[in-house]
Amino acid sequence: LELLHAFVLVHDDLIDRSEKRRGLPTFHKLVEQRLGPLSTAERTGHGVSVVVGDLLFALSVETLQGTSFMEGHRSAALKKLLSYITDTGVGEIFDILLGSRDIGRVTAQEIERTYLLKTTRYTFEAPSVLGAVLAGASPEKQEDLALVMEPLGLAFQIQNDLLEFSHFDSRDQLLPTDLLEGKKTLLVHEAYERLG
């Protein structure tokens, strides 16, 4: 699951043009720095990031397939894993499309749906439910676990949005990254609604 998480973050950072993650340069920025001031450094960083993300995806599937869990449990977990990856991709598309719209034309429900698909599914639900599947938990227990993880994942994403502003260093840049990138977060949406 760590490989899956890294796969999503490498692609997400590239799509968002993020320069840092957890205070360190993102993967595509590392590639650009490594290549130096070449005219193609940025393009190369982007291209390598896409392929590295793809490799991490393949490795996450291969790692699951190589485990010693019962075949039926492993197959069920792989099916769920691929479903989570699909949801994450759809959520990323929603995030990109929301980014192209004016904040006044975006609803809190659309942002929450994006959070659920893009973040909650793979950060909270997938690790918990996949562990339950591999342990042989019933479909009902898996569903119960997914329902418990949903609000935790949403809370995590909202906290992450708040941290973007609370750890903002105006010496580094003029505005927090989410604002510079036009991210449609619940925090930005709420501020718009109140200040409208």
Please report, for each region that a protein language model flagged, where it lies by residue.
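Mg2+-dependent prenyl diphosphate-binding active-site environment of isoprenoid biosynthetic enzymes
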Residues: 1-196
